Amino acid sequence: MSLVAIGINHKTATVDLREKVAFAPDRIHDAMKSLATHTQSGEAVIISTCNRTELYCNNGEEADVVQWLEDYHQLSHADVEPCLYQFKDQEAVKHLMRVSAGLDSLILGEPQILGQVKQSFVKAKEAGTVATTMDRLFQNTFSVAKKIRTETEIGAAAVSVAFAAVSMAKHIFSSLSTTQVLLVGAGETIELVARHLKDNGVKTMVVANRTISRAEAMCDEFGATAITLEQIPDFLPKADIVISSTASPLPILGKGMVEKALKQRRHQPMLLVDIAVPRDIEAEVADLDDAFLYTVDDLQSIIEQNMASRREAAEQAELIADDQSYQFMEWIRSLESVDSIREYRTQSMAIKDELVERAVNKLAQGGNSEQVLLELANKLTNKLIHAPTQALTAASRQGDLNSLGQLRTMLGLDKD
């Protein structure tokens, strides 16, 4: 039995190649069935995200899995092979654990990958390509990822601009659930900010954008209110937190607009986070009392400090992955003995049944019970020790002291 993992990711391949080896969600069930059949492994899980495509098989050969990937996507070996990484057994297990814990991610320690791995596992179960080994592997992996996040600081510090912006708000306000938030822009960064805010209990969000339809589409997901940029002065006085990220070449929030809003707020403090380049909020806003303005540069210094913290945590996480992958392989190796134990027990029972049947027949024919039992015991002993005796004799004749020592240990002859 051997575990195989092959894949490409953001570190080994360009976006162009990653797109070519990705698996469409509506085809991944059939793909996993095809992979399991092709490799005759019976078990296969495919993880396919924007940053990586990875194939995990049980009882497969690396070359067969690579061949299947190339054939499936109609790619040449010359295109794929230089970008591939391959792992086997404990290294394959450790790699999956590292991936799931965010140790192999573009952003070290990011939590989203664990959810993506879980989704891939669910799809594999739906496809019928998960049995005992893969089920145990992935369930163990999820536990290890949780252990790493619990016992280390790998996910504690913000390392994205969006997350850092929300983390700053959490430090300033005791509870985000009672705050009102104005988001300026409706791009990917603001969408990520909105998701973090919602996860942290924010209930009232307003999204201002030049194109109202784009803002409305985002608001549907987060239960927010969409407005145009021209409506910002009407909503700004109600905002405890303002986070802005647009592509505007000129500032959208000027000192005068913010000053007027603060007066209407009766000088209740306002946190403004400008994560746009060029700036969305005039730098002079920082001169206003009760206005606390932070820029992307302020956040970047926080992120750099946090990345250093995560790298330290990653060293601890690697040790956990090492230990847990070794323990999993011990379980795998224990499985390999099950068939041998079952076969040995069956063989011994067959010998016993044959000899007992003979003894019963002799007793039925009036044989002396003491002699019959003694003969049964002797024959049973001789048959059961025949194979070990031959092995001991062969090892001795060949001068194989290592095998001889192992046999003595297995037979319980060397007792401390």
From Swiss-Prot:
The record marks H95 as: Important for activity. SUPFAM superfamilies: Glutamyl tRNA-reductase catalytic, N-terminal domain, Glutamyl tRNA-reductase dimerization domain, NAD(P)-binding Rossmann-fold domains. GO terms for biological process: protoporphyrinogen IX biosynthetic process from glutamate. InterPro entries: 4pyrrol_synth_GluRdtase, 4pyrrol_synth_GluRdtase_dimer, 4pyrrol_synth_GluRdtase_N, GluRdtase_CS, GluRdtase_dimer_dom_sf, GluRdtase_N_sf, NAD(P)-bd_dom_sf, Shikm_DH/Glu-tRNA_Rdtase. CDD domains: NAD_bind_Glutamyl_tRNA_reduct. PANTHER family: GLUTAMYL-TRNA REDUCTASE. Homodimer. During catalysis, the active site Cys acts as a nucleophile attacking the alpha-carbonyl group of tRNA-bound glutamate with the formation of a thioester intermediate between enzyme and glutamate, and the concomitant release of tRNA(Glu). The thioester intermediate is finally reduced by direct hydride transfer from NADPH, to form the product GSA. This is Glutamyl-tRNA reductase. It comes from Shewanella piezotolerans (strain WP3 / JCM 13877). The lineage of its organism: Bacteria, Pseudomonadati, Pseudomonadota, Gammaproteobacteria, Alteromonadales.
